[in-house]
Amino acid sequence: MDLETKVKKMGLGHGQGFGAPCLKCKEKCEGFELHFWRKICRNCKCGQEEHDVLLSNEEDRKVGKLFEDTKYTTLIAKLKSDGIPMYKRNVMILTNPVAAKKNISINTVTYEWAPPVQNQALARQYMQMLPKEKQPVAGSEGAQYRKKQLAKQLPAHDQDPSKCHELSPKEVKEMEQFVKKYKNEALGVGDVKLPREMDAQDPNRMCIPGGDRSTTAAVGAKENKLAENKRTQYSCYCCNLSMKEGDPAIYAERAGYDKLWHPACFVCSTCHELLVDMIYFWKNGKLYCGRHYCDSEKPRCAGCDELIFSNEYTQAENQNWHLKHFCCFDCDSILAGEIYVMVNDKPVCKPCYVKNHAVVCQGCHNAIDPEVQRVTYNNFSWHASTECFLCSCCSKCLIGQKFMPVEGMVFCSVECKKMMS
């Protein structure tokens, strides 16, 4: 397929999840409606992951595409219908007998994802070492956490040009080369193993503090005894605390098998969130999630959330923007050369600021222009003018004077305050 055809086929999937309720805004949101180039809802400005959208198939396609053309193809299967790679997510179902007064019932727990290991007891141990609120039990807070992290850590628009907004053929080519490079050099999936099993595979390895291992072979009975003792001294590469005997550890092939992590310590070095499904990116001795690895390699547009592959872009408010995406967060008007105000780290044009965000003057009850001086006390504001910042009793101008505040009123003296009480 040539680049022109690829560009024409691009679309952001605007029909997906349409009308789904927002789990954060509740009834304040009319239902999910994807913005035409931002990755947020047009109604409430929350992301798709904050809405009750069934995304399991879409997420499995996304991860499947990530693993395509890598050594992790054993984790994907291609659909016969369209050849799309699907992530073979390992689902774990545990059944626990629960004793009641008369009968024994079966309590079933389904994990929406579990480490792909043959030993289910090891997978169960791994899950128990995660914080309760991050265990991906179906229908739980942990499952919702995993869903959010899949969206946050592995954005589809970081690997698939068809999920991006109006890329040029040149940008498509550059993105494809970038994705190929990080698949070859950084992408990995953690392995859950017992440290002693790793030693059994290579008896010459001995563990020393910090998770690092030496390759000095033991010679003689005393040396063998010393080596055996040292093998129990495992420590986590992240927290440097010791690993308990019999507990599972996570290894990352890109990092080398001389390093290991507690399950709860296998986190992104930037956002410090659990690496979703143990999918990591390794760079300069650090673990990253997909998002923050890409951020370390390319600028990201604060408007559309996509990586920038163009040589021309703008920087404002310590953020990067596609030239066409430096827009008002409320009305999408271009802000180049215009006056704007930052509201919650988002640029807003002056008319939208006055209409939607400006504070109201307690004196004249009109919105206060962002370029006009004002007086603020607690949650109340006034125009800093002789017409507005006045004693609520005698109308004396209080600019530069002492005053007594009472809720939304101000007084020049105790006498004026008493007269209004």
Curated annotation (Swiss-Prot):
Scaffold protein that may play a role in cell adhesion, cell spreading and in the reorganization of the actin cytoskeleton. Plays a role in the regulation of cell proliferation. May act as a tumor suppressor. It comes from Equus caballus. CDD domains: LIM1_Testin (cd09413), LIM2_Testin (cd09416), LIM3_Testin (cd09419), PET_testin (cd09829). InterPro entries: LIM1_Testin, LIM2_Testin, LIM3_Testin, PET_domain, PET_testin, Pk/Esn/Tes, Znf_LIM. The N-terminal and the C-terminal halves of the protein can associate with each other, thereby hindering interactions with ZYX. Belongs to the prickle / espinas / testin family. Keywords: Cell junction, Cytoplasm, LIM domain, Metal-binding, Repeat, Zinc. GO terms for cellular component: cytoplasm; focal adhesion. It is found in: Cytoplasm; Cell junction, Focal adhesion. This is Testin. GO terms for biological process: negative regulation of cell population proliferation. Residues 133-164 are annotated as: Disordered. Residues 92-199 form the PET domain. One of its GO terms (molecular function) is zinc ion binding.
